[in-house]
Amino acid sequence: MRVRDLARTWLTHLAVERGLSSNTLSSYRRDIERYCDWLEAARIGDISEIATATVEAYVMDLRRGVDGRAPLSASSAGRALIVVRGLHKFALAEGLVGVDVAADVSPPSTGRHLPDTLSVPEVETLIDAIPTSDIATPVDIRDRALLEVLYGTGARISEAVGLMVDDVTHTPEVLRITGKGSKQRMVPYGSMARAAVDDYLVRARPALSKGRTPVLFLNQRGGPLSRQSAWAALKKAAGRAGIAKDISPHTLRHSFATHLLEGGADVRVVQELLGHSSVTTTQIYTHVTAENLRQVWRSAHPRA
């Protein structure tokens, strides 16, 4: 079977049978199209023509950068390999090949990258940089509510902008967050986030709304707030607050997890709140808190 035809069938399977989100599917499509392009350049068109050495050569080229493409980091090449593995696993399951040639291909080695976080005072400065007084604009009020939700729940930006008004509940006081694979989780949100969301619903959202859209966070035209606009709001707040750290879309999520663990929360509870399918993913934050402890020890202990 032609690899491109197989790729289209597989992506349809992921959308229909697995229920992957449109964002995840778009990412998979980009990775698999890059793989197909590379195979065609190597004059390989049929899935049966691919060997383990072929996949290994592809990963090496991802790291080097070929055909005018920039080299990928080890982590990015590793994610691309995961997609390729998924395609070959599907080919085996469908009986199109007799062996999964990608199963034993190792991802590029990468050093452990500890996620960047903000301290508690930095988070407070970040959020307080957005006006809340009577002169605050509807966008200011919306942005403050958005940041409070991101830090108060650990939601991904894509999850936060995907919230519906009906996802906000007061009895109990939780947000219904829809994560990867359309999996839902109920996450408590604290008094500061609740107050900011309530203020937004009363003072700002009616001014932004141009119709009856059920989406919680709206843009200035009354439509759903995009991930890019939410990210811009976070960067704008960081600029107002004078925070020099390199803020990423996941910074508040990382900070949420780190501060919970530093406060004594069990790692499996944090796993549930973040919506991680495996506790291994969450344990990266235990390394962050351990590193913080080592830094304090080095600066304070007389024999450090």
Swiss-Prot record:
SUPFAM superfamilies: DNA breaking-rejoining enzymes
Extent of the signal sequence: none
Organism, scientific name: Corynebacterium efficiens (strain DSM 44549 / YS-314 / AJ 12310 / JCM 11189 / NBRC 100395)
Keywords associated with the record: Cell cycle, Cell division, Chromosome partition, Cytoplasm, DNA integration, DNA recombination, DNA-binding
All residue ranges annotated as the Core-binding (CB) domain in the record: 1-92
Protein name: Tyrosine recombinase XerD
Species lineage: Bacteria, Bacillati, Actinomycetota, Actinomycetes, Mycobacteriales
Example of a GO MF term: DNA binding
Gene: xerD
GO biological process, any: cell division
Active site residues according to the UniProt entry: R156, K180, H250, R253, H276, Y285 (o-(3'-phospho-dna)-tyrosine intermediate)
